[in-house]
Amino acid sequence: MPKQQIEEFGWPAVPRNRSNIPSKASAKTTPVDANFTEIWPQSDVVKKAQAHVKSALPEETYNHSLRVYCYGHTMVTQHFTAWIAFAREEFFETWALACLFHDIGTTPENRGDTHMSFEFQGGFMALQQLQAFGAPKAQAESVCEAIIRHQDPGETGTISRMGQLVQIATEFGT
């Protein structure tokens, strides 16, 4: 995978144990307003994904997905600016796609189609749908992996930035 795509789509590894996350004591930021219409990506793939997911998810779950986006966007712009130093637009587009699809596997229709966990089912569904919408393979795979691992925190190894962000932001976005 080209190095540029690694940065653009949130692939760089971070510690799975979250040792890279600022503590409450060290995170000295003031509250910020997040204007959704200003921070939400407007690319064709995001528009297609948003329409698809909005029609597939219950309203509460869809709204949860949008809240997760806002929390994660704020976390990155306040505490992880290095993550977006070279590819801000692409990173947040990928982030929006991960947020939209992260619970797609929880619907009764999608749970009834498989014996896999909702994370795996949703990840694979997102991979297939995003590629059909024209997302680059590396971007669709980043979203897929983040969804598969979003309920899998741990103490050892690493996870992609996108995966870690989904884990953390979903904890706030309930």
Regions found by a protein language model. Name each.
Residues 3-107:
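Acidic/His-rich, divalent-metal-binding segments that scaffold phosphate/diphosphate chemistry
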Residues 58-66, 109-121, 136:
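Active-site metal-coordination segments of metallo-dependent hydrolases
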Residues 60, 84-92, 114, 135-139, ...:
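Short, surface-exposed helix-loop/turn micro-motifs enriched in polar/charged residues
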Residues 79-83, 126-139:
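Inter-helical turn/loop segments and adjacent helix faces that build the functional surface
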Residues 90-111, 118, 122, 126, ...:
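His-Asp-centered metal-binding catalytic motifs of divalent-metal-dependent phosphohydrolases/nucleases
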Residues 136-174:
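Histidine/acidic-rich helix-loop-helix segments that form or flank divalent-metal centers
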